[in-house]
Amino acid sequence: FSAIRVSPNYSNDKTVFATTLGDGVYRSVNRGNSWQLFNTGIANKYLKGNLEIAKVGSTDYVLFLAPGHGELYRRSSSETSWTKLLGTTAGVSIVAVSPSFAQNTTVMTASTSGNLQISIDGANNWVDRGNPTEAITYGIAIAPGPAREIFLATSSGVFYSNDLGITFTNRSTNIPDETINNIAVSPN
């Protein structure tokens, strides 16, 4: 598997998702005891990108898949297939969703060149932020809450934004001058 995620309602639905380097997406609805293909709507099944899941409502979720070929897909718990949101020309390499997605519907992507895009309506409309850090982005973390603070792990360190990605400040003080390849924020 190249990525594995559990449903935000796992205690009730026992659902787990996994992506593979050849077969696409699998879903288990019984704690991983058995798996079914979950690919309808995805063209290329070789998935080297990332999969994110966000809670919406008390029992629903939405999945966002950046397969690693430039495009971005979305699928909700009630949909029967994936919907392509952005084509390969977008160059999407990673996707991140707000931990407060049910309240603020914020999604952010980064391309292989470091170009950022943000959506504050559940990925229906996108705003291109360019490459404000002039670096390659390897990870995105959106802080919980209404402020939607954003942290980037980049080839030039850690960057921070408190204005939905319009501006970023380098926050790499006391970190070695090297590439940061992942970043996360506390859920609290």
Model segments located where?
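Extracellular glycan-interacting surfaces
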Residues: 1-188
